[in-house]
């Protein structure tokens, strides 16, 4: 299949491109910067920049994968929050415009979202059947992001809303979470009771590939491992794998002072389960956190 991907140069996008091209799909990566590649089954197409005309360069596209959006890591000023939201909305609207330009519509859209759409809770468990929330910046952003995708779904295109948990890999949150343990200063963050719905980046890429190739999957899909953990368990698992102590607690108020509103990512959470992936037959390689962390650290993919 011909697959167009936004956000293809990012953390997940690079892994996903490898998975899809190895399956024989041709991936067209939409990027602000034009570039050449000798990699088989991969083409870069310039978009969202001066002089770009992706509608003239793209062939018929069978599947769109929309991952584009500014990273949520970093202190959230009002300007940063505006950019986080607008980058996602504008990219999705441009995808819609490009789809409308095609003579033949694609079969599928994979629209990125996040488990933050459920809000936060210590007690509740969230599946794709659960109600969504609009209680904070993350849930509000995910809600509006999916709403933009619904305009494309209304064109009769099978749409999967990939609600991502915290991805573990060589980039993203994990290197930052491991860093204190390198300096023998690891410990429980906040109360330690907050949930972390994690997923190994390779399982995340494989789950998206699975959704692309299985026409029976549509609507929201939690892209998380089947065994979420609380932050205390997560920290103790890092300590075991790294052979480092777990002893120095990090109070919630300290994180709020240091990180501002972004501390919400760390001190709040939700227990999200991948019900749709499991019932449809997807098989996880990394369902156990200790195995996932051991593999990442052993392969030196993570500092």
From Swiss-Prot:
Coiled-coil residue windows: none
Disulfide linkage: none
InterPro entries reported in the protein's UniProt record: DUF1731 (IPR013549), Epimerase_deHydtase (IPR001509), NAD(P)-bd_dom_sf (IPR036291), SDR39U1 (IPR010099)
One Pfam assignment: DUF1731
Family: Belongs to the NAD(P)-dependent epimerase/dehydratase family. SDR39U1 subfamily.
Protein name as catalogued: Epimerase family protein YfhF
Organism classification: Bacteria, Bacillati, Bacillota, Bacilli, Bacillales
Gene transcribed to yield this protein: yfhF
């Amino acid at each position: 299949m011909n697959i167009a991907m936004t956000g293809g140069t990012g953390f997940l996008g690079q892994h996903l491109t490898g998975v899809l091209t190895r399956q024989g799909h041709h991936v067209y990566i939409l990027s602000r910067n034009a570039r050449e590649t000798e990699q088989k089954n991969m083409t870069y197409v310039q978009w969202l920049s001066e002089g770009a005309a992706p509608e003239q360069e793209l062939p018929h596209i069978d599947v769109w994968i929309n991952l584009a959006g500014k990273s949520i890591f970093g202190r959230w000023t009002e300007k940063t929050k505006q950019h986080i939201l607008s980058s996602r909305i504008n990219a999705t609207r441009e995808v819609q415009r490009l789809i409308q330009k095609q003579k033949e519509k694609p079969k599928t859209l994979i629209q990125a979202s996040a488990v933050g759409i459920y809000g936060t809770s210590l007690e509740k468990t969230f599946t794709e059947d659960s109600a969504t929330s609009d209680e904070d910046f993350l849930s509000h952003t995910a809600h509006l992001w999916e709403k933009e995708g619904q305009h494309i779904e209304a064109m009769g295109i099978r749409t999967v809303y990939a609600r991502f948990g915290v991805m573990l890999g060589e980039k993203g949150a994990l290197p930052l979470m491991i860093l204190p343990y390198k300096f023998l200063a690891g410990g429980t963050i906040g109360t330690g009771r907050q949930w972390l719905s994690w997923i190994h980046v390779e399982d995340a890429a494989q789950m998206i590939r699975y959704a692309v190739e299985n026409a029976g999957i549509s609507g929201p899909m939690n892209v998380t491992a089947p065994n979420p953990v609380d932050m205390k368990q997560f920290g103790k698992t890092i300590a075991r794998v790294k052979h480092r102590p777990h002893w120095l607690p990090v109070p919630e108020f300290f994180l709020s002072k240091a990180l501002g509103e972004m501390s919400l990512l760390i001190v709040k959470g939700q227990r999200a389960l991948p019900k749709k992936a499991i019932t449809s037959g997807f098989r996880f390689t990394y369902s156990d956190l200790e195995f996932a962390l051991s593999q990442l650290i052993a392969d030196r993919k993570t500092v």
